[in-house]
Amino acid sequence: MAEQQKTRVTVDIYGQQYTIVGTESSSHIRLVASIVDDKMREISEKNPTLDISKLAVLTAINIVHDYIKLKEEYDRLLQKLHKEKDE
């Protein structure tokens, strides 16, 4: 079994540099990091007294919430598509 090529990218998230290693393209990794950075900054603006750990947890909760809503919408649309296909 062939091993996938790994991409190593250094990104900046909320003023900290992280080296991310993954199988996605460097542009994809940078996009993910940018979304996390943007969400952390958005939450920090509304809650300036949060320490970095709590900010990170709230960011994760917000991003997973968005993911679940999108997944539910995707599943709903997929179910609708299958229903229309079967008619």
Swiss-Prot record:
Family annotation (Pfam families): ZapA
Keyword Membrane: no
Family: Belongs to the ZapA family. Type 2 subfamily.
The protein's name in its UniProt record: Cell division protein ZapA
InterPro entries named in the record: Bac_CellDiv_Activator, Cell_div_ZapA-like, Cell_div_ZapA-like_sf, Cell_div_ZapA_firmicutes
Any coiled-coil regions, as ranges: 64-87
Assembly notes: Homodimer. Interacts with FtsZ.
Biological process according to GO: division septum assembly; FtsZ-dependent cytokinesis; septin ring assembly
Entry keyword annotation includes Repeat: no
Top-rank taxon, per record: Bacteria
NCBIfam families attached to this UniProt entry: PRK14126.1
Function: Activator of cell division through the inhibition of FtsZ GTPase activity, therefore promoting FtsZ assembly into bundles of protofilaments necessary for the formation of the division Z ring. It is recruited early at mid-cell but it is not essential for cell division.
Signal peptide start-end: none
Broad class of where this protein is predominantly found: cytoplasm
Protein source organism: Geobacillus sp. (strain WCH70)
